[in-house]
Amino acid sequence: MGATTMDQKSLWAGVVVLLLLQGGSAYKLVCYFTNWSQDRQEPGKFTPENIDPFLCSHLIYSFASIENNKVIIKDKSEVMLYQTINSLKTKNPKLKILLSIGGYLFGSKGFHPMVDSSTSRLEFINSIILFLRNHNFDGLDVSWIYPDQKENTHFTVLIHELAEAFQKDFTKSTKERLLLTAGVSAGRQMIDNSYQVEKLAKDLDFINLLSFDFHGSWEKPLITGHNSPLSKGWQDRGPSSYYNVEYAVGYWIHKGMPSEKVVMGIPTYGHSFTLASAETTVGAPASGPGAAGPITESSGFLAYYEICQFLKGAKITRLQDQQVPYAVKGNQWVGYDDVKSMETKVQFLKNLNLGGAMIWSIDMDDFTGKSCNQGPYPLVQAVKRSLGSL
């Protein structure tokens, strides 16, 4: 059974066998939050004061950048931000807070030339350990978006050397070992090209699977598609049958990542389109991205607190095959996640004994509770309730 001919059924046959060999424990609820959300206007302005320290088991601050093999501190306010974030642990000592380096804007180029030589990698690793310890972080998340085929060895070596250094630091420290995680792609071609999965599985504590952005206004031909479908749609053929959470999770496990190290990403935002005709279903022709939201101000993209406003007067359809909703109002189409789809996704990950759920990101949920009339953090709370013990 070659990977090139792997379909959903044969993929899951192998995964079920693997799952029978693995046990489960308490689930993780890993919550990213972004340092640019503090610059948004109300009600989207998000600061550490908005964080409930008991909401998530792990918080990941996104993103720090690297320059000259060291993490950059932009200004004193960023140091103050680190202190405020990590002070949440005085209220909840069980909370783990990680620093994420990289991200979409930093891209792959940002990791060069640091990864290119053992000397520069060592300089970075020594500096990051010192940085994490000095600022009271519990670990590092590497969000290299994404290593290409030539770079996957660099990525593997960087992760391995970080893991070894974290272990060495732990043996001479009175503190717990620093955690090491990575934000990784959910695209099959990217998984094949970017990651030496079996090696990464030995060195990472867990992966944060970016199981969203499966469809958006960047695609050609430009047609509507859901941001994060749980399952394959009836119309999906060929490569598009891989563009769903179920396939991505199964493929990572098939490639050698233990299920308990897979933390499945669930988005608190949707992707939107401007419809090109009267057709409104999934796969309907679109003329471009949807109109920008009033707070996030990015075309083709809406945070959940903006989606709630959009839903007033919109027609909502729940996709029975993909198990997620979309909404249409006028010529605007948005595919998003709601409380029900969150609960369905958590049941899916529990059935597979995954490590838990990851939220991208808590600052795009209705964290104030003022936009959706569902209380603060309705989506994250739905995930938390469904997961049970953390």
Swiss-Prot record:
* An example molecular function term from Gene Ontology annotations: chitin binding
The leader peptide range reads: 1-26
Q: Mostly located where?
A: secreted
Q: Which residues are glycosylated?
A: 35
InterPro entries in the cross-refs: Chitinase_II/V-like_cat, Chitinase_insertion_sf, Glyco_hydro18_cat, Glycoside_hydrolase_SF, Glycosyl_Hydrlase_18
| Any one GO BP annotation for this protein | chitin catabolic process
Name the cystine pairs: 31-56
Pfam families (UniProt xref): Glyco_hydro_18
PANTHER family given for it? CHITINASE, CHITINASE-3-LIKE PROTEIN 2
Protein name in UniProt: Chitinase-3-like protein 2
Organism, scientific name: Homo sapiens (Human)
- What is the primary gene name for this protein? CHI3L2
